[in-house]
Amino acid sequence: VQTALTRDQFRSGVFARDGHKCVVCGSAAAPLDAHHIIERRLWPDGGYHLDNGATLCEQHHLEAEATTLHCDRIRQLCGIKAILLPPHMEPGQPVDKWGNPILPSGMRLRGELFDDPSAQRIMAPVLALFTDRVKYPRTFHLPWSPGRTKDDCVMHDLSAFQGQEIVVTAKMDGENTTLYPDYMHARSIDYEAHESRSWIRALHARVGPDIPTGWRLCGENCFAKHSIKYEHLADYFQVFSIWNGSNRCLSWADTCEWTELLGLRTVPVLYRGPWNEAAVRACQRDQLGGDACEGYVVRLAAEFHYRAFRQVVAKFVRPGHVQTDKHWMHGPVERNGLAPRPTDPGTG
């Protein structure tokens, strides 16, 4: 892990490594720019890392900002072997300068800075490459979460919760699934048919036409057993967030209202009220409704933008929780059980 430099150290280090000339055309004529390969606003420390910098002339700096000059090409020209990414981004996922994920087809997903006005202006030449699909963000662990691995990220700064109303919901052991009006996918944007997804596909056929254009529903598909065998689920699909056409997560109150309108259910609520660390910690439990409990998720009750996700959503995972995605995808599907259904479904 590289230590962040000061701005001056970054500039002088990048220029010295690159011989004080543009790594693309070899021009030494001023002005030269110490270009951030990945936008510095995406980094918690400002992104002033030597392996996140490149010396570019004015023309190639503009091309890099517009992303017509690709990050991988810049790294190659600089002799950078390791791909350095902000900690909240998934290793191995190619992204452009602005953090937008790049698919194998060359199409791009909308990242957290996609709708930033400055990014929109400079990316004008490539906007036709973007789909309306959005990958669900990586959720950081709370500092006291014991179920994290060495590759997981931890939210050390909890200041965004201070003085705010929060909602703590049960973390369900299923498959993170996103529903659009005309499409659905799990964490991977490419939909892959699987026996465990037949039920959610039928549900999507019913509710998809009622999802507003540009919106998406995110929830847990608990149809198939993963690590926990459920016997008392309120429903197989449980909503935990709804996003509007401006890539804003609806407030929890609006999420519950929309969930009820669509005839769905939210994940169970464990606590709702002002931020109180003791109250949040008290949400840890071994059982919930007769089933084992994987952990819990904390979020602001108010609406927030996609780019704020890593500051306002965090999780606690029980100790020793085993992820079995590869196993359950390749083995026989074991269907979870439902609790007796009330006549009029509520949304928790």
What is each of the regions a protein language model found here?
Residues 9, 29, 163:
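Short coil/loop residues immediately preceding or within conserved phosphate-binding loops
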Residues 13-16, 23-26, 47, 228-232, ...:
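Short, conserved, surface-exposed binding loops centered on an aromatic residue
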Residues 16-17, 59, 261:
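Residues at alpha-helix termini
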Residues 19, 28-31, 181-183, 213:
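Short glycine/proline-enriched coil/turn segments at helix->beta-strand junctions
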Residues 23-55, 64-75:
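Histidine-centered nuclease catalytic patch
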Residues 49-52, 58-130:
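A detector for short metal-coordination/catalytic motifs
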